[in-house]
Amino acid sequence: PNRTIQILLYGPPGTGKTMFAEALANELNMTMHRCKASEIIGSYLGESTRNMRAYMDGIINDESPRILAFIDEFDAVAGMRTGHNSGADGEMNRVVNELLQCIDAMVQSNKDKCIVFVATTNRPWSIDPAILRGKRLDTQIYVGLPDLEARRFLVQKGLGGSVPPKSPDVDLEQLAKRLQGYSSADISTICEKIADQPLFRHFRTGMPSCVTQRDIERVLAANPTSVSPELEGRYLAYNRKKGF
């Protein structure tokens, strides 16, 4: 059907929000208009507003039947407006006003096409409420930290199989359990660092080696989670109130 669907994906950094948008575009064979909010923010007065209009006009004028519009780091261009109309605050107020007008124009332009507008943020509580109401981004989806099943998958992907070789004391199931509270990106990085340890030893000694439990302990000690329990709690509280 010819319609506009608008979704806000929120959650901790490194949980795959951007990958979700890319997968959606590929799966549905959609033309993707992708940008980061930092690409919209300009250095000169009025530049950010013009960049926002140019990006949204590209979506509105695209004649493709299925379009996915994607803005990463959305809170940088959609923050709560203030009562100040001068300086940096005034400029950001104008950017948000322009964004609201563009979203409404995008909804009205979809008579012969389907538009899915996806925005991602690590700070959903900082977004101007007007953007999250009515026919705008009123569908909010929490993309949280991986559960045990997802952590098992990530650990097996990074360390399973015969490469890298592992000593008998290595327990990947236990590692997956210990990685509770880590983001998907954190886990992938940790697995890469663990897998590199035998290679580093080989460079030093010239002898073949394998992943040991000591390697795992060393890497975990040097790489704490990037998401604190307090921050995760804030996301969960927001999700109970606003999302699903």
At which residue positions do the language-model features occur?
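C-terminal engagement/docking regions of AAA+ P-loop ATPases
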Residues: P1-N2, M19-F20, Q174-T189, L199-F244
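Amphipathic alpha-helical interface segments
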Residues: K193-Q197
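Hydrophobic face of alpha-helices
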Residues: V96, S188-C191
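Walker A/P-loop NTP-binding motif of AAA+ ATPase domains
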Residues: P1-R178, Y182
